[in-house]
């Protein structure tokens, strides 16, 4: 229960159709390479797991609604560009009322590898691992790999509402994706109970209160991009795009709303230090319970240190 609650604090960065209603007899298509893969729910250097020890996104959704209302198709892999599953995914989406696409990346090690007597892994030219993140895995771009973006775009043409769940170990670019989907949940690696936690968020049993601990860039050309860059005489500007990230550090949405009021600031100054105490009143003004991350940003306008 503790694990499920912690993972439920994942970030919702777009939520125009969330939360979904339970027991409404609507067909749900669950599609994507991260929808039903236990190791893709976990981080790098994960030890071998039993199937029963990890709840995938698909299993979590099935635990929440009638199994007959859930249609699953993998669709594509993380990196492999084989098109063998595309048609099944399109058929599943066409027969559903709403589509949940579980995409992203993976740090999953391949525990099915065979090894030589020397200990070296046998490599097959026909096998392309899902792994695109973790130690020793660098990227030249931050786009969704393989056919993932193409699959999102093809399903968008069907006119069905799309909820995108991103399971991943690094920030990924959302340009070309935001306009194709109706909601985005940034789940990172949600862990062993991730499927149940994700279903709680999707169906409104838990209000996602997480906020981004990084900034998500608009392109790799913006890197490095973070919330507290050193102030210089010239601010970063680009000829091709704006200088601010797509989603800033601390960003996140909620199923409810909060109102701040009565802020009080007190100073306790000494010869060597200055302690600032800040108090603020927060009221939940919405219809759902929820958590709020109070964020305070400070900037030293004049400092003797750089």
Predicted features along the sequence, with ranges:
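Solvent-exposed loop/turn segments at secondary-structure junctions
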Residues: 34-37, 76-80, 105-110, 168-173, ...
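An anion/phosphate-binding loop that grips the pyrophosphate of nucleotide cofactors and donors
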Residues: 96
